[in-house]
Amino acid sequence: MGLPWYRVHTAVINDPGRLLAVHLMHTALVLGWAGSMALYELAVFDPSDAVLNPMWRQGMFVLPFMTRLGVTHSWSGWTVTGEPWINEPGFLNAHFNFWSYEGVALMHIVLSGLFFLAAVWHWVYWDLDLFEDPRTGEPALDLPKIFGGHLFLLGFLCFNFGTFHLTGIFGPGMWVSDAYGLTGHIEHIAPEWGPAGFNPFNPGGVVAHHIAAGITLMIGGVFHLTARPPERLYTALRMGNVETALASAIAAVFGAAFVVAGTMWYGHVTTPIELFGPTRYQWDQGYFTQEIQRRVDSQLAEGASLSEAWSSIPEKLAFYDYVGNSPAKGGLFRVGAMDSGDGIAEEWLGHPVFQDGAGRALSVRRLPNFFENFPVILTDGDGVVRADIPFRRSESQYSFEQTGVTVSFYGGALDGQTFTNPSDVKKFARRAQLGEAFDFDTETLGSDGVFRTSTRGWFTFGHACFALLFFFGHIWHGARTLFRDVFAGIDADLGEQIEFGAFQKLGDLTTRKS
């Protein structure tokens, strides 16, 4: 036909069989990518330390999504929570449990192959009676009825996902955790039908809304399968034009993309920090700092020493309170996982407490999210600056040497140790600026010391960008179908006359090609 690359889709505009074929092929490609990507991630994933080297620091993208739906173990014998897994006989007594990372990946690949074969079949056998309008004998699609069918099927899947998979009636449930991402596990969830169900961090709301949305969609599907749209509405919204369906579908996709970009970036029960990493706002607001301090104060009130109080802090909680885990530290065009930046975390050094020569307890002002460099400033309990690392020594008034700053560690690997050498104290002050101090292995991966973003940042960036592109795609195709008669200069219902290649002379019905 000699069509340019950006016009090739016109080949399926009036060919329902092959329109179906290309959609089947698209689904096959998506399934194939998902399964292949899962196998690749499993090949490079290191499950040895679920606390300091979780999947979101290793740049895993599809594994977190599998995990939040209830997949937690691998055929290799490990689980995402750190416990070993004993492989028991599964389907047909085979020692391969298909509700595992490898099992789900392989099922996607097998299904991809089946969809590929279906696409080939429908491309070859495109001229089916199913797609023929009995009134005209021409290929046609009853788009309003197809819309109803899609609504019903979508509602059926949505309802069953909420009713069976999430509740555990026939399924594993979903990933749930506490507010600080410490106790993550898979759990059967009961639906929450009250106002609490609208809390974005209440898993019961996810179940209830899937059930309710499924019922609503099925009702809508039955309605559109049984009722015909009014003629004026059918004409006004160009319901007979497949480009209308395209514009509507794009709207659904970009709407969903904007929503999930928001739930990922701002945090939601479906995007737990144990699987996707903390949000940037948890660093901005000192979310984990406050919880750690609350726990320490509680221990001190019960008579514990500073060392005992800080030693009771879970290493996992301390690790969240580190700026290198904020997705906003990724920077533009910094490819790779977080581990490729600051390295693989090995151990918590402990909580540093600074003190000046006058005996005042000092704290280091922490690095804001959007700064790469920030002055090292130490303030007392009233916020008064008492020490710093000066840019110009000749004008220094608050240098560590002048103010006699020392540092003592409580909890962690350096528990009970005090450092008085100014060079050592400065080193730990620079680390304290980034949050809790950790030792990192930078040699294994050749880490370059430049922060990267987490899975949360990549997902948000990708979906926000594509949502914007699809938004303009919706405007483009929606305008084309609504104002087709204006753009083409003819009535919208005379599409046959301008079909490419149907007539020797465009629009002349007497020159139809046989």
UniProtKB/Swiss-Prot annotation:
- InterPro entries on file: PS_antenna-like, PS_II_antenna-like_sf, PSII_PsbB
Q: Does the keyword Nucleus apply?
A: no
Q: What is its main location?
A: membrane
* Entry keyword annotation includes Cell membrane: no
Q: Which UniProt keywords apply?
A: Chlorophyll, Chromophore, Membrane, Photosynthesis, Photosystem II, Thylakoid, Transmembrane, Transmembrane helix
Q: How the protein sits in the membrane?
A: Multi-pass membrane protein
Biological process GO terms, please? photosynthetic electron transport in photosystem II
Molecular function (GO) terms for this protein are: chlorophyll binding; electron transporter, transferring electrons within the cyclic electron transport pathway of photosynthesis activity
Taxonomically, which superkingdom?
Bacteria
Give compartment(s): Cellular thylakoid membrane
**A GO cellular-component term linked to this record:** plasma membrane-derived thylakoid membrane
Q: Which Gene3D superfamilies match?
A: Photosystem II CP47 reaction center protein
The annotation note on the cofactor reads: Binds multiple chlorophylls. PSII binds additional chlorophylls, carotenoids and specific lipids.
Q: Which residues are listed as membrane-spanning?
A: 21-36, 109-123, 148-164, 211-226, 245-260, 465-480
For this protein, the record's HAMAP family field holds: PSII_PsbB_CP47
Q: Of which family is this protein a member?
A: Belongs to the PsbB/PsbC family. PsbB subfamily.
**In UniProt terms, what function does this protein have?**
One of the components of the core complex of photosystem II (PSII). It binds chlorophyll and helps catalyze the primary light-induced photochemical processes of PSII. PSII is a light-driven water:plastoquinone oxidoreductase, using light energy to abstract electrons from H(2)O, generating O(2) and a proton gradient subsequently used for ATP formation.
Q: Cite the record's note on assembly.
A: PSII is composed of 1 copy each of membrane proteins PsbA, PsbB, PsbC, PsbD, PsbE, PsbF, PsbH, PsbI, PsbJ, PsbK, PsbL, PsbM, PsbT, PsbX, PsbY, PsbZ, Psb30/Ycf12, peripheral proteins PsbO, CyanoQ (PsbQ), PsbU, PsbV and a large number of cofactors. It forms dimeric complexes.
Output this protein's name.
Photosystem II CP47 reaction center protein
Which organism is this protein's natural source? Prochlorothrix hollandica
Task: List the lineage, top down.
Answer: Bacteria, Bacillati, Cyanobacteriota, Cyanophyceae, Prochlorotrichales
Gene this protein is translated from: psbB
